[in-house]
Amino acid sequence: MNYKEIMNSEYYYATYSRIAEIKKDYPVDHAFLHIRHVVTYAKKLAKIFKLSKHQQKLLYIACTLHDIGYLDGRENHAKSGSERAEIYLTKLNKLPKKDIEVIVSAIANHGGKEVLDFSEPVSMCLAIADKLDFVGSRYKNTNPKYDCSNYKKIVKNEFVLKDNKIQLTIFVKNGFNIEEFNTSHFGIKLKKFLDLLSL
């Protein structure tokens, strides 16, 4: 079993279609586009951190399932998602129990709120890949309640491992306001995450 099989499954389509519907008025995509972005970032991170082929397989499966907990709401979606993933993967009966445990642990810890969340390579790479997805294309919402104009000016980001630290470069369009970004909900969350990662 691999992540492409999951992405082509009825379960994946139905689950993320429902999440897209639930979060349609929310300014950030947590469905198909986000999952594709997270898998792409994870592939780069897997090379940077030299994950084995087996670890890569588990990482990409975790990426495809990491936000399924949004079916139960935003709060504790990582825990809920890990429980849903365990049920789904166990039912498929295509992976050994120890592999399912690695995937489920990565999903449970993808919030990256504690240093321990980075103790296992698959968990670490999923948490980082998830946080790196703040590019403008993810902000599709037109709900007037949210102003996403500054976020939409983020074109892409690139990252490398330098001196045992991730160096993040953000490419933006003219008019991007870094102060506004740094004091926004996501900017503050990203800074806390990067600070934790550098401990």
Question: Language-model segments: which ranges?
Answer:
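Conserved, charge-rich beta-strand/loop surface module that forms ligand/interface-binding patches
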Residues: M1-S17, D130, E179-L199
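Acidic/His-rich, divalent-metal-binding segments that scaffold phosphate/diphosphate chemistry
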Residues: M1-N76
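Divalent metal-dependent catalytic cores for phosphoryl transfer on phosphate-bearing substrates
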Residues: F49-V160
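Terminal helices and disordered tails flanking the catalytic cores of nucleotide-processing hydrolases
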Residues: G136-L199
